[in-house]
């Protein structure tokens, strides 16, 4: 395993194994360049599979961004500095494909357009966003609040499907440095009566805790905009007649 900054290998490790195995290793990077909207620095990660007798068998490359999201004294922080969000609620529609972009360039254009309008964050509302969108957010420096489509009627089936799909989404996307917040629930959709029904409130709290257990490297907004029972941030959605 090698971590590269440009053409230079800045960290590496070799792990011996046999047969099918899950490998974990920890690499130390001295004085890392932290990812931020102003400097969305990414490191290349290279994994090479070697056979002691025949040499290289396979190689895969990816990338990683290093950053810290925290809440300090009631203030959302990125890399230890107070963070002021200029965010847009983005439902990810495309004229040709509704929720599906027809090209990778269309996804990149969405990120570039958001940044060009002066925003530094997008809340991907009611959509598990395309991984290529997240790639461009990582690369171009757009922070993301990641959400999922909500259920409508509270039931055992909702609990099972939502929990399974949410876990899959977190495990798929948690390596993206651009994601600074997980939003498992929006405005009590699917849990409309959590203030009166303990089982609904317990479900919200359980999913919030599950999210933190799967990934504690960013904040969790348990129920965005409506009743608060758990999570790192308390958010309000205020609607005014125009």
Language-model-detected regions and their locations in the chain:
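Secreted/periplasmic carbohydrate-active enzymes, especially glycoside hydrolases
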Residues: 1-124, 128-131, 136, 140-144, ...
């Amino acid at each position: 395993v090698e971590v590269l900054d440009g053409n230079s290998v800045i960290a590496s490790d070799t792990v011996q194994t046999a047969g099918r195995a899950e490998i974990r290793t920890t690499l130390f990077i001295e004085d890392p360049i932290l990812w931020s909207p102003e400097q969305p620095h990414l490191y290349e990660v290279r994994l090479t599979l070697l056979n002691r007798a025949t040499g290289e068998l396979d190689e895969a490359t990816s990338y990683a961004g290093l950053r810290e999201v925290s809440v300090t004294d009631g203030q959302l922080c990125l890399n230890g500095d107070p963070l002021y969000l200029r965010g847009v609620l983005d439902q990810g529609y495309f004229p040709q494909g509704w929720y599906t972009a027809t090209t990778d360039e269309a996804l990149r254009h969405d990120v570039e357009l958001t940044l060009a309008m002066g925003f530094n964050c997008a809340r991907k509302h009611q959509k598990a966003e395309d991984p290529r969108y997240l790639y461009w957010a990582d690369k171009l420096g757009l922070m993301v609040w990641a959400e999922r489509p909500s259920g409508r009627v509270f039931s055992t089936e909702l609990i099972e499907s939502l929990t399974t799909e949410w876990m899959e989404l977190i495990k798929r996307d948690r390596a993206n440095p651009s994601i600074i917040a997980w939003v498992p629930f929006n405005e009590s959709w699917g849990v409309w009566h959590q203030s009166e029904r303990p089982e609904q409130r317990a479900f919200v709290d359980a999913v919030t805790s599950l999210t933190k257990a799967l990934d504690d490297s960013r904040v969790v907004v348990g129920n965005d905009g409506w009743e608060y029972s758990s999570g790192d941030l308390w958010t309000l959605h205020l609607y005014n007649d125009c």
